[in-house]
Amino acid sequence: MDKKTLCLYFQVHQPIRLRKYHFFDIGKNSDYYDDFANRTITRKVADRCYLPANRTMLELIRKYGKNFKVSFSISGMVIEQFREYAPEVIDSFKELVATGCVEILAETYSHSLASLVDEGEFKKQVKQHADLMKELFGVKPVTFRNTELIYSDEIGEMVARMGYKTMLTEGARHILGWKSPDYVYTNSINPKLKLLLKNFRLSDDIA
């Protein structure tokens, strides 16, 4: 029986929460962030989600070796909060990367929509994120995942020009039609960029 390959990728992101900012605060208070909510939520998801999940991933890697591999897309925003409130989460990702069975993906630093509005800002954030991944994990990402898997051939061509070999995107039914998301496609402007599509049915089943 032919072996089937399943590509698992996990998005890791937490937004920075803003506090309630009243009209009379204008000009008097520049403390925009809700530090209490950011700390509380980051600690909660670290203890209930990220740390247990990473322990499970590590156990599976130790059990199955190179036959079990995963990838993570970790935003700059969540790294900032991990550094402040839950540094042990970063350590757990470092331990996973050190196994050689984990790929770190590139994305925009701020989990932003810059690819839709400003090419310069988009490139700046992608480089900022890639530099952070290199600093933390000692790896240079070669696969790109845009915010919410946003894709167009023009965005893909930009990504290819930045040196990325592969890009993840949504396997949207209204785009694919009769085609399957379970194949490797290419960018129509720059065919050197490979496209891996999300199988939304399978993702929904295991989420």
What are these regions, as identified by a protein language model?
Residues 1-142, 149-204:
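Catalytic alpha-helical scaffold of carbohydrate-active enzymes acting on polysaccharides/glycoconjugates
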